[in-house]
Amino acid sequence: MYDIKWIRDNSALFDQGRERRGLPKLSAELLALDDARRAAIAESQAAQERRNAASKEIGAAMKAKDNARAEALKAEMAELKAVSPALEEAERLAIAALDRALAEIPNLPLEDVPFGRDENDNPELRVVGEKPVFSFVPKEHFDIGEGLGLMDFEAAAKLSGARFVVNKGPLARLERALGQFMLDLHTGEHGYTEVNPPILARDDALFGTAQLPKLEEDMFAAHAGRVPQEAAGDLYWLIPTSEVVLTNLVRETILDEKQLPLRFTACTPCFRAEAGSAGRDTRGMIRQHQFTKTELVSITTPEEALVEHERMLTCAEEVLKRLGLAYRVVTLCTGDMGFASQKTYDIEVWLPGQGRYREISSCSVCGDFQARRMNARYRPEGGKTTRFVHTLNGSGVAVGRALVAVLENYQREDGGVNVPRALLPYMGGITTITRG
């Protein structure tokens, strides 16, 4: 979220950043809203100040036995009192209009983010690992899972509809093993603190990380019982990512600089409506309403944020290296960035069944964009004035897509799947998954 004072002082820079995102200029409209807000506040305050002054003048007039003056002032007071509610309402509406407009503005890209329109313009940063070579035509993950009798989309559809899956037996264990492996790696070697957070969150938490108000249509809401729509105060949201709850751990707090960086990780179910994905990845586990993801969140200072971004990317990459999966890293162009991001790296894992790379992790630096919405600050060492923290988030990595990658990269001609060496300690002696 941007400070209107910063926009007023840097209107050309603000508009240039929007244009790089492919968005129209907006500073003039925002400054007009701010002018209206200032005028409404000034008018309301002037009326209140006049009421206060008139009250004192009435006392002085009565003390001087100037009844005519006192009565005139009382009449003026009555008029001011009568218009006061309208002035206060105008002030409230003017403030709300500006706040609403500011809340819907995406973050601006850093200068080194490549310009582009969509994912086709994302430059490749590096390619890592060797793609497996098969003596047979590799299958896609859903054919492998269904062939094993362990991946059941029909049963899931009976329970919940489209874009759900039921994994069973050793395949379910393999998925659980992936999440455990990721948490152990990030907590044991990468310095993250494991968190087991709620997966239901309130409006203010999702506003803080900027899923609300812009991304509401892509989320699932939950009520206690069949609550009527007007009972919005009891509304919860199923988290689309544990970034929401991990980042909000510092909402409305003032940290000491020596506490930073804070690094959190969690492996949770996530829920997305996939509102804009009609017709895409309709079969399989690539794009589901419910999926498991291991999340990485860092809270740090402005000076260390970019270094922390590179570190987070390295931590996410290490998951794929340990699993022996080939991947590439791309930098998202200005037209493909997320709403809250200043800069994003995507890691795309190689899927031989599909014959292409698919996203398995996004690592983003957000600057103070989320911190301003959350009012999350820190006090520099030896300083009196507080500053906004900088926040980062990344997938470390998507567990469901990691399962897809393992199935496709470790498949065998007989339909079985070898378990990656890194996961063997979690599999209870299972080294190969075959049809039972």
Curated annotation (Swiss-Prot):
Binding site for ATP: 272-274, 359-362
UniProt cross-references to Pfam families, sorted A to Z: Seryl_tRNA_N (PF02403), tRNA-synt_2b (PF00587)
UniProt key word Signal: no
Pathway the protein contributes to: Aminoacyl-tRNA biosynthesis; selenocysteinyl-tRNA(Sec) biosynthesis; L-seryl-tRNA(Sec) from L-serine and tRNA(Sec): step 1/1
An MF annotation (GO) of this entry: serine-tRNA ligase activity
Main location: cytoplasm
Catalytic activity: tRNA(Ser) + L-serine + ATP = L-seryl-tRNA(Ser) + AMP + diphosphate + H(+); tRNA(Sec) + L-serine + ATP = L-seryl-tRNA(Sec) + AMP + diphosphate + H(+)
Keyword Protein biosynthesis: yes
A GO CC annotation given for this chain: cytoplasm
Gene3D superfamilies to which the protein is assigned, alphabetical: Bira Bifunctional Protein, Domain 2 (3.30.930.10), Serine-tRNA synthetase, tRNA binding domain (1.10.287.40)
Sites where the protein binds L-serine: 241-243, 295, 395
GO biological process: selenocysteine biosynthetic process; seryl-tRNA aminoacylation
Subcellular location: Cytoplasm
CDD domains per record: SerRS_core (cd00770)
Enzyme class: ligase
Role noted for this protein: Catalyzes the attachment of serine to tRNA(Ser). Is also able to aminoacylate tRNA(Sec) with serine, to form the misacylated tRNA L-seryl-tRNA(Sec), which will be further converted into selenocysteinyl-tRNA(Sec).
Subunit structure, as described in the record: Homodimer. The tRNA molecule binds across the dimer.
NCBIfam families: serS
Family, per entry: Belongs to the class-II aminoacyl-tRNA synthetase family. Type-1 seryl-tRNA synthetase subfamily.
Comment block on domains: Consists of two distinct domains, a catalytic core and a N-terminal extension that is involved in tRNA binding.
Protein name as catalogued: Serine--tRNA ligase
